[in-house]
A protein has these predicted regions:
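Glycine-rich P-loop/Walker A and Walker A-like loops and their local beta1-loop-alpha1 context
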Residues: 2-66
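Structural motif
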Residues: 24, 125-128, 162
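Short, aromatic/basic amphipathic alpha-helical patches
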Residues: 39-41, 63-72, 173-180
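Short, charged/polar "capping" segments at the starts of alpha-helices
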Residues: 59-64, 86-87, 170-173
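Nucleotide-state-sensitive switch-loop elements of NTP-binding domains
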Residues: 70-98
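Phosphate-binding/switch loop-helix module in NTP-utilizing enzymes
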Residues: 87-149
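Substrate-engagement module of ASCE P-loop NTPases
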Residues: 143-169
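Phosphate-binding/switch region of NTP-binding enzymes
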Residues: 159, 165-193
Length: 193
């Protein structure tokens, strides 16, 4: 059953991001693990693309432990906004560690730096994991401003984006801006993928 769910999620993500520049994914918390597995399998299946994965939800070390075998193609870079805040101090050449998830300007700067040196003909993708986690550390208005600015920059730079949000943790204003700034919204339900 788990593979069916993951395969269904991969197909929905692939279909959505191939025709839309920005995709918002709203999901219940209990589907988060399946969704992240589907995302990493999808990223791994696209070795000639460049991905930047911004994690506020889980430390890079735990992501590497679970999905590290999918990073060997060298097309996925990470920006970790949670490890340092949790007291985890590691160094990894594949990851930029931000001191705190409240440093939204620094996160934005590192995202744009990660894409800056790539060739123009490479398709670029950004994953934000997750908007709802940013709300734990930041005021709603700051997250709204950050996401609006990020969305505008990625569109100008021709970077496709996937923004995750956990339904149970979302504020109404952030949900509205996610709908406004995303070309496509995928709503994951527990019973239907």
């Amino acid at each position: 059953m788990g593979n069916t769910i993951i395969d269904g999620l991969k197909e929905r993500i692939s279909n959505a991001i191939s025709v839309n520049q920005s995709v918002g994914i709203m999901l219940p918390g209990n589907n988060y693990s399946d969704l992240t597995q589907a995302l990493f399998e999808f990223m791994n299946s696209k070795p000639k693309t460049a991905w930047v994965y911004v994690t506020i939800t889980n430390p890079y070390g735990s992501i590497e432990k679970k999905f590290g075998d999918m990073f060997d193609k060298g097309n996925i870079r990470f920006i970790d906004g949670i490890s340092r805040a949790a007291g985890i101090y590691e160094i990894n050449p594949n990851c930029v560690f931000i001191e705190s998830p409240s440093q939204l300007e620094k996160i934005l700067l590192e995202i744009m730096n990660a894409f800056r040196d790539l060739e123009n003909n490479i398709q670029k993708y950004l994953v934000i994991d997750s908007l709802s986690s940013l709300l734990t550390y930041n005021d709603v208005s700051l997250v709204t401003e950050f996401f609006t600015h990020l969305s505008n920059r990625t569109k100008l730079e021709d970077i496709h984006s996937i923004s995750l949000s956990i339904e149970e943790e979302m504020e109404e204003n952030i949900s509205k801006i996610l709908y406004l700034k995303s070309n496509k919204i995928i709503k994951v339900r527990e019973s239907f993928i």
